């Protein structure tokens, strides 16, 4: 599993970035277990729009909302592309460990998502290379 999105950007070293939620990408089994363990709710994904996931859930019982996705895909150029990460960088947080994609993979993912806010994120992440 990986933390990605804005939270991963901060964990990678962007200290001036606002994190409204934590995005987690994991397997369908782990997604269901995490959502259940933190009293979240699995939400049916209509598969429309820019993103779709085999399992999607929100956890609102935590200090910051958590969005959990499994087998997430993004629509780019009319085609669906699976969101995957090759790297898994450990980051120590409050005596535990979280995993994030490398900065280079975070940049690639932002570009794949392609929204203006994602392209801005890619630009900000370039500072860390």
Language-model region placement:
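Compositionally biased terminal segments of proteins
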Residues: 1-129
């Amino acid at each position: 599993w990986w933390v990605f999105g804005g939270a991963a950007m901060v964990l990678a070293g962007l200290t001036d970035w606002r994190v409204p939620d934590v995005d987690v990408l994991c397997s369908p089994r782990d997604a269901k277990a995490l959502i259940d363990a933190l009293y979240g709710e699995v939400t049916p994904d209509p598969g429309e729009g820019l993103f779709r996931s085999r399992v999607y859930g929100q956890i609102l019982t935590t200090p910051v909302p958590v969005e959990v996705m499994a087998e997430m895909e993004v629509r780019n150029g009319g085609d669906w592309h699976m969101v995957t990460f090759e790297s898994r960088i450990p980051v120590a947080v409050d005596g535990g460990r979280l995993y994030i994609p490398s900065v280079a993979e975070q940049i690639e993912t932002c570009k794949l998502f392609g929204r203006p806010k994602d392209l801005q994120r890619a630009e900000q992440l370039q500072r860390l290379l």
